[in-house]
Amino acid sequence: DMKIVFMNKQPADIENVLNDNIVYVGSDEMESGKYQGEFLSDYFKAQGKDEIKYLMVNGVLGDIAQIQRTESCLQAFEDQGMTAVEATAPVVADWDRANAQDLISPLVNTVDFDCIIANNDAMALGAAEAMEQQGGDLENIPIVGIDATVDGCQAISEGRLAMTVFQDADGQGFGALTAAVNLIEGNPINEGSEYELDETGHIMWVPFEPVTAENVEDYM
C-alpha cells in the first residue's frame, strides 16, 4: 500500500483519513491559542483584572487553524477564570497583514478593548501598525500572534507585540521525513525523534513554544 505523510496542514475529516499507511505530522493548533490565552490571563491578573474585552483577528473562517487557535485561546481564558468578551464582531483578515491593518484602523478610537488576539503574526503586525497610525496605546494594549516569524519576533523585541507562539517548521520537516522512513520500515512513526504520538499512533505532534520579551532572543 502507498504510504502518505501529511505535514503542517491537517486534512479535512482527519479522523477518517488517517490509518496505518496515512499519517500526519504537525503542531497541535489547540496548543497555540492556549498559550495566547494563558499569557493574556497572567498579564491582566497581574493588574488585578479578571474581566477583559478583546478584539479577535481571524484567519480564513473555517480553516482548521483559525477554528482551533480561536477556540483554544477562549478556552484558556475560561480555564484561567477570566471573563473575556469580544469587543466587536469578529474581524476576518484572512491571514493577511494589510487586511488586518485596514480592518483594525477604524476600531482603534471607536471601540473599547483591552487586547488584540491575532491568529497569526502577519495579522498581529497589521493590527500593531493600525494602532500606531491611529494613536492607539500599544504600551498598555497587548497584541499577541502566532508563528514567531522574523518580523513577529523583531516586533516583540521592539515592544510592538507582546508575545507570539513558535511553530517549529524545521521540526515538522524532520518529523515528516522521520515518519516516512518509519512507515516504510514498519516502525512507530516517531521512532528516532523526541516527538509524541496521539492515542491512535497516526499523528506525530511537534510542540508549539510560547515566545515573549523574556525569551525572544532565542528565536531571532
Q: Where would I find each of the regions flagged by the language model?
A:
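Hydrophobic alpha-helical segments within soluble ligand-binding/sensing domains
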Residues: 24-52, 99-101, 148-152, 168-187
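Second-shell loop/turn segments in exported
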Residues: 19-30, 59-63, 88-93, 112-114, ...
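Short beta-strand elements in bilobed, periplasmic/extracellular small-molecule ligand-binding domains
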Residues: 53-56, 74-97
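Hinge/cleft segment of the Venus flytrap/periplasmic-binding protein
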Residues: 57-61, 65, 80, 175-220
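Short, solvent-exposed amphipathic alpha-helices that sit
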Residues: 32-39, 64-83, 99, 103, ...
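Flexible loop/hinge segments that line or gate small-molecule binding clefts
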Residues: 1-31, 53, 149-157, 161-162
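Solvent-exposed loop/turn segments at secondary-structure junctions
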Residues: 10-13, 30-31, 60-64, 91-96, ...
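Hydrophobic alpha-helical
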Residues: 1-4, 72-73, 89-154
